[in-house]
Amino acid sequence: MKKTVLVDDRAIKEINKFPKAVRIKIRAYTDILKETGGLQKPFTKKLNTKLNLYEIRIKHKGTWRVFYAYCGKKEIIILSALHKKTQKTPLKEIRKAEKRLREYL
C-alpha cells in the first residue's frame, strides 16, 4: 500500500549533515516505505515506546538512525536522525523524536 512520506524540517537539517552515501541509503529506504508501507528487519526496528516509533538502521562507516512514525493510514513522518556513537540508542534522541511526533498528532 503506497504511503506519503513527510520529512520534518529539523530532520532534513540533521540528515543533510550526513555523508552522501548515508543520505543515498536513507533515500532508498524512504522510497521503499513509500511503495510498500514498511521495511523489514534488520533495516528497521519498532522502539518500545508508548507512541508507534520506528528506526531505520543504517550501517556505513558507523551506525546511523532515522526515526519515523506512521501518522494515520497513509502518512509516514520522518522525525529525526543521528549518527549513533554508542551501542544503545540514547534515550534523549528517542524522546526528541517522540516530542516531534506529538507536534503532528
How should these model regions be labeled?
Residues L79:
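Conserved catalytic cores of phosphodiester-cleaving nucleases, focusing on short active-site segments
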Residues R65-A69:
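Short, surface-exposed beta-strand/loop micro-motifs that present aromatic residues
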Residues L82:
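Residue-level signal for short, function-critical loop segments
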Residues M1-G62, G72-I76, K85-L105:
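Basic, Lys/Arg-enriched alpha-helical interface segments
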